[in-house]
């Protein structure tokens, strides 16, 4: 098992009578992309602010690189960079000057380091342009350049694709993968965009109403419980009629194929049932997604 880079132990934050985060235990390992998922208002940004010591917890501890942040703040945070919510810049200054000023808050950064960070995020050609001329997506990428400027061992990104169009989201996703694969950074990625996390993260935690409701490998969490399958069958109308009569099958959509929700352990049984009923099956494919899993467990948690 890889070394634990970031750990929270019973981390909690209360505002008045409301618990924004309650008894949170996270385990982020070296070199991985860790997805931190939850709907808006789940407590993700509050958690990140506590990790970065921007907000004092009501109770609990944060350990980074094996040490409690409270007693080693300067030492630890010199190896960490986080962008909370949207990055802010001096709009009337150039991208280069912004990174020079913001980087100097940690240490003096060189011209080469600034250009290298801008090159990684695809903004080297715009280094001299004022940030006020940048699109939202370019500002998000500049924020990531700021995060990696001092070569941190841990990068914390809070909703980095927020407000981006599909192309911008794709660029940020590819950038996150590049930081992990080519630069060896451990990345803590907060998002409510579940398909984005599914595409890049090895492990994840799911937060709902301030409480941890799941944590583990994405592949393992996705394989648990009911799944969605798309069935291509002939004759389609007869197959649909059979499926609607089976009590443990939920037909959720029909079109070129039939989308059903079943217990994944009964997929082979359903396939046999259709074949023995005279249905020609040309495709029976799983459609399980992280969103299905997320909706399932958050619905379950809200019913408790």
Located regions from the model:
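Alpha-helix N-cap/helix-start and coil->helix boundary motif
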Residues: 12, 96, 120, 194, ...
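ABC transporter nucleotide-binding domain
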Residues: 173-261
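Short, Lys/Arg-enriched, disordered terminal segments
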Residues: 1-3, 303-304
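Alpha-helix boundary recognition
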Residues: 65, 78, 198, 222-223, ...
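Short, charged/small-residue-rich alpha-helical element at the C-terminal edge
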Residues: 227-300, 304
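ABC transporter nucleotide-binding domains
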Residues: 3-8, 13-189, 194-208, 212-214
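Residues that scaffold the ATP/ADP-binding catalytic core of kinase and kinase-like folds
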Residues: 72, 221, 293, 297
């Amino acid at each position: 098992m890889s070394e634990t880079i970031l750990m929270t132990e019973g981390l909690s934050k209360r505002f008045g009578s409301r618990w924004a985060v309650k008894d949170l235990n996270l385990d982020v390992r070296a070199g991985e992309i860790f997805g931190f998922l939850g709907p808006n208002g789940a407590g993700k940004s509050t958690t990140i602010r506590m990790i970065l010591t921007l907000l004092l917890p009501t109770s609990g501890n944060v350990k980074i690189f094996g040490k409690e942040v409270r007693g080693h703040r300067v030492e630890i945070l010199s190896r960490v960079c986080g962008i909370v919510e949207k990055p802010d810049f001096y709009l009337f200054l150039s991208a280069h000057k912004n990174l020079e000023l913001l980087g100097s808050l940690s240490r003096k950064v060189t011209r080469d380091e600034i250009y290298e960070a801008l090159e990684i995020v695809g903004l080297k050609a715009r280094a001299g342009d004022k940030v006020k001329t940048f699109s939202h997506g370019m500002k998000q990428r500049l924020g990531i350049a700021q995060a990696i400027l001092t070569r941190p061992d841990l990068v914390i990104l809070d909703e980095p694709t927020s407000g981006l169009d599909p192309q911008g989201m794709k660029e940020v996703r590819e950038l996150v993968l590049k930081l992990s694969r080519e630069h060896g950074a451990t990345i803590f990625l907060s998002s409510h965009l579940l398909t984005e996390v599914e595409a890049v993260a090895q492990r994840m935690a799911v937060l709902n109403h301030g409480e941890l409701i799941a944590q583990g490998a994405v592949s393992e969490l996705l394989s648990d419980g009911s799944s969605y399958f798309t069935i291509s069958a002939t004759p389609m109308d007869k197959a649909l009629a059979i499926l609607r009569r089976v009590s443990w099958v939920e037909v959720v959509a029909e079109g070129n194929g039939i989308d059903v929700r079943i217990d994944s352990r009964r997929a082979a049984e359903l396939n046999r049932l259709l074949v023995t009923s005279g249905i020609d099956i040309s495709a029976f494919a799983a459609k399980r997604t992280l969103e299905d899993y997320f909706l399932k467990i958050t619905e379950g948690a809200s019913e408790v």
